[in-house]
């Protein structure tokens, strides 16, 4: 099973909180890094580096420039997972073991928002 959207959002929210101090509850897929979260370019690079480390992916600079929202990053990571399903399963196990509470909180919030 691939990493779920909720698990990726939880992981990205954790990274954003570490880099910027923004509360994970404020981070949703539609939020723009610049317009909504007020993240500057230096912080965005740090978020990208930590995302690469956490998810075992490489985000080229030209791709990073096109990732404008949290949802864009989620979609990008999911696309990379589809290209390498074995790595995605190992990644899912790692994320859930490191962030079970965060993953559960994001899942609950998304379920509430969709009602």
Curated annotation (Swiss-Prot):
The modification O-(pantetheine 4'-phosphoryl)serine is found at residue 41. SUPFAM superfamilies: ACP-like (SSF47336). 4'-phosphopantetheine is transferred from CoA to a specific serine of apo-AcpM. Disulfide bonds: none annotated. GO terms for cellular component: cytosol; membrane. Keywords: Cytoplasm, Fatty acid biosynthesis, Fatty acid metabolism, Lipid biosynthesis, Lipid metabolism, Phosphopantetheine, Phosphoprotein. One of its GO terms (molecular function) is acyl carrier activity. It comes from the Bacteria. Residues 3-81 form the Carrier domain. It is found in: Cytoplasm. GO terms for biological process: lipid A biosynthetic process. InterPro entries: ACP (IPR003231), ACP-like_sf (IPR036736), Meromycolate-ACP (IPR053393), PP-bd_ACP (IPR009081). Acyl carrier protein involved in meromycolate extension. PANTHER family: ACYL CARRIER PROTEIN (PTHR20863), CARRIER DOMAIN-CONTAINING PROTEIN (PTHR20863:SF76). Belongs to the acyl carrier protein (ACP) family. This is Meromycolate extension acyl carrier protein. It comes from Mycobacterium leprae (strain TN).
